[in-house]
Amino acid sequence: LVPRTWDDVLRAGPKLKAMGTPLGIGISPDGDSNYSLMSLLHSYGATIQDEGGNLTINRPATVEAVKVAAAIFKTGMTEDVFVWDGYSNNRLLASGKGSLILNAVSAIRAVETQNPALAANIALAPMPTTAAGAGGPRAIYVVGVNVIWKFSQNQDLARRFLVDLALDQRETLQRSLSYNLPPYEHAVPDLAALVDKDDRAQPPDKYRILADAPSWSTNIGHPGHANAAVMDVFNQFLVPKMFAAAARGEMSAEQAVKAAEAQMKPIFDHWREQGKI
């Protein structure tokens, strides 16, 4: 069984925690917590900014997402999620003492190598959504960026290389064990077939969900671009801090969202003045 909605996660949390296998969603100043909690926001249709780069964090959808996350923590998780690092959820999964984490496939790939019997009992699922499916694309993770220096003497050749690199990702997908998904649909024409039969997985079609991952995944800064302001918000961990304030009971969800807006507004104002939004 896998959770389809955040309500599923909320209902299951107390039972799983009572069994000694709590949920494991980081609420710490850490990259993985950023990815997880920004994805949770998107699940509810909440965003940091709109398509034009305007700050939109203080919305009812954000408050709802924060309330749900706080409830999930209080009933299904333990205090250590507030101090997690980038490997904490991996360790919880590998220990066999956690029931759910939010991470890339690298987490289960490690377990497949270290403990195949445990890996066979771990399922994969898309990022949960709301009952109404309000969020559309909801999962975010690392998006690679390549640049060409202005002083380069081989700019045309560099552009051709980057185009070829982006449009031929089959070997990259295979060598990364399905961790590095293609940036464009036709970069791996047989993506569905490749992830439908995985020799390392039990069952072999465990990674089938990756075939349509582009339909429920998006970039940091969605629905806008990953601009300087969004990355400042990311690097200062303002989203995890917002969730943590509510989960710890230091603020209500409404207060936590309003405080986050107050922290983010100067960042957006600064970068807009610099012409970076």
Question: In which residue ranges do the predicted regions lie?
Answer:
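Paired acidic/hydrophobic, glycine-rich loop segments that form the ligand-binding mouth/hinge
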Residues: 99-104, 123
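Glycine-centered hinge/linker elements that transmit conformational signals in sensory
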Residues: 10-16, 52-83, 123, 127-130
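Short, well-structured alpha-helical segments that form the helix of a local strand-helix-strand
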Residues: 10-14, 93, 253-265
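Extracytoplasmic/periplasmic solute-binding protein
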Residues: 7-55, 61-62, 98
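Bilobed periplasmic-binding protein-like "clamshell/Venus-flytrap" ligand-binding domains
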Residues: 17-30, 168-179, 266-277
